[in-house]
């Protein structure tokens, strides 16, 4: 993409669309003819993001523009500058789009009126923007977010009534607002209080234009900033400049589902954005900066040399000498040579005060490789602390100077240990937050454990500050620890325990001691040991390594007071606490478990992950969060990755038969395309299938009541037991509810199908458990399998646990005859888990069995499986007809087919499985007939397969009931026996 400079043309021609670009003659662009389409993006933006497609034409206003050295100019309106969040003279990347995407479908919203009129030629439109027709807006476009609206575009029109009104984009932006005029003598000298928020860039305070006027300050003026504390002199003021912070937004947000509203909201008048380093030096809490006191800087004056004018605004003097110390960190070596890094940093004058921590950027610094550990650029910033400043300090609240390469001599005085400010790590915004979505409670608990050891009297605390964090892989353990360290200003040293494993115990011991020694050199710090269960095991992984376990325990319980000031805290993560040696586990006085994500937490994570992505109007994130029951943070991130991949596959498949060319794909990526609900659905199915096969993760089946024929009374009883507590929890405030349901009856009557349909209709996750699969040969493993089933169900709540063949899992105790009493213990564990369901409101248990008389009687007592529902065979023709209609509703039947006549040829006693066998046999007969007709050339391959009356009658003649009349009578006797109890 070529580099270009934006020049404001004022006034902008009224006959030209406000978001178009005028090309001066003689530029690098080809002859426009009927016009060009350019893709524009700010020069600092990533090339992977969508760009803004604009029309480029030659206009009368472009004739007088003189081409000078440097990038070619583009004449634009102020409206386009606002869209790109840039100012006049900004540089952009411009790319010629030779084949702009042609929109295949678009949804337009129009106000009541004459509607759309005819237009000659294609029209370049963007989702969320207004059309030249008054009162019309583009709500949705396919396949791209922006493209050409032409004769081949299918239009869907809806009324604008009830939707968001036209925002500020419909107003005329060709003329800028009048600039603020504030005289110096009218400026206020009083102290003002503003609410601080962590944010902004650089070293300056960010305020809105109206707030700057209300403060009586000028752009770039120096002010004293201090915390508003109850105790006097508790916070030493810091010097900073005031800059107007313009609201910014990304193009993907502008073209998102809420793009009809103004993307960038103006800053509140009483709000000030504080850079992280300045907030740290002020002693502010990163989460809640609180109220700040702003006072004009009245002392000193900057008199630039060799200039004909000087600023009337007062400013701090330059320091003659600046003595700094490098702060020890695990991400860079404190013994490296960073003269060039410091020289480039101080080429711009910087404010320095004694005790301040300076953040020096290493972006683009190749020299940092020489001083980096392992010769890798592991950290984007380096930290230094101001030890002493020498200069003529004017009288004021504190001594503050400016330091640069011209007026100041810089001395590096050594190393120091100190807290550091929390800065963005360069990861995506959800994981770079001080309160990661879905993990706020865990981060708060970690901070509550670590913070007392950082207080002045923290060395007097008994016990170590070691935390064991347990959670499944991908649950956000490392993210939570990183956020806690950022809140507390701690260094973080991440060490995967797989890198500490070695061939001998002595080598592992040496690596452990070196790791702890390295962490102590950069205190206060947190040493994060991931997968700590890998340590303390022998090479085969079967037994414990006593030497390694003893060494790790000794390092964790080190009580040396000198080494704890500043402290070194250890956080270890594991997926299974049971795999950790007992001696190591007892060395952690604090154990935390990553909580299961609730539906609200999953929704907040999805909203954070998709905040900068264009979504289709039909995407329902709350419904998607409901379907992701049991997912951890990593699963939701993988869901988004699979969704993007599915969207790319869909876009490629939507092209011509030969596929999209490389140029077409590039133009489509520049225009951007939304993520649709079908992309999320396809990705979710892939993940749920993979999880179900790997770990038995619960999922929601796709079975509805239309798939279940008959059984109306059974449906009613099941819904009263399960649906009522979900829809009206206030009716069950006394805790009186049924959580267990037992379906019994002959085989093949649809007991499993009923349970799946209930899960689908009530939007519940479904966890199917076969009785024999929980039995294990090892002692205690069968009981643990039962506990894990209920734990997975609680994690995926609201959930239904379906126990099929329950009589094989929970027979009557004392009759099993096994030598170890395994079945008796399994039944006892199952009873204990069922009793604990009363504390979990959204977990239901459904059991299915053919022989309820073989079950342990304790299972059928109140509070467990206290609702018995008999699912019998269909005996009357009306119920059999409903079942047969449900099975054949997806078949293509001939018009002459009569299902009632088919049933007249069948035996009287039929179960649902028998009727399914009838349809399967008839379909096989139809397939054989189809193959025979194709071989004889009597039928085309493209014709549909029809099920004829003859096929069904042949299958009915061969049908034999799977349950005899004697067996049905026996099942009815069992029903009467349990109904009388």
Curated annotation (Swiss-Prot):
Organism of this sequence: Mus musculus
Main location: cytoplasm
Modified positions (Omega-N-methylarginine) in chain numbering: 119
GO biological process: protein import into peroxisome matrix, receptor recycling; protein import into peroxisome matrix, translocation; protein stabilization; protein targeting to peroxisome; protein unfolding
Name by which UniProt lists this protein: Peroxisomal ATPase PEX6
Classification via SMART domains: AAA
Catalyzed reactions: ATP + H2O = ADP + phosphate + H(+)
PROSITE patterns hit by this protein: AAA
Residues involved in ATP binding: 471-478, 745-752
SUPFAM superfamilies, per database record: P-loop containing nucleoside triphosphate hydrolases (SSF52540)
Quaternary organization: Interacts with PEX1; forming the PEX1-PEX6 AAA ATPase complex, which is composed of a heterohexamer formed by a trimer of PEX1-PEX6 dimers. Interacts with PEX26; interaction is direct and promotes recruitment to peroxisomal membranes. Interacts with ZFAND6.
Subcellular location: Cytoplasm, Cytosol; Peroxisome membrane; Cell projection, Cilium, Photoreceptor outer segment
Sorted UniProt keywords: ATP-binding, Cell projection, Cytoplasm, Hydrolase, Membrane, Methylation, Nucleotide-binding, Peroxisome, Peroxisome biogenesis, Repeat
Function: Component of the PEX1-PEX6 AAA ATPase complex, a protein dislocase complex that mediates the ATP-dependent extraction of the PEX5 receptor from peroxisomal membranes, an essential step for PEX5 recycling. Specifically recognizes PEX5 monoubiquitinated at 'Cys-11', and pulls it out of the peroxisome lumen through the PEX2-PEX10-PEX12 retrotranslocation channel. Extraction by the PEX1-PEX6 AAA ATPase complex is accompanied by unfolding of the TPR repeats and release of bound cargo from PEX5.
The keyword Nucleotide-binding belongs to this UniProt entry's keyword annotation: yes
EC number, UniProt record: 3.6.4.-
Annotated tissue distribution: In the teeth, expressed in ameloblasts and odontoblasts. Expressed in the retina, at higher levels in the ganglion cell layer and photoreceptor layer at the joint between the outer and inner segments.
Gene Ontology molecular function: ATP binding; ATP hydrolysis activity; protein transporter activity; protein-containing complex binding; ubiquitin-modified protein reader activity
Gene: Pex6
Family, similarity comment: Belongs to the AAA ATPase family.
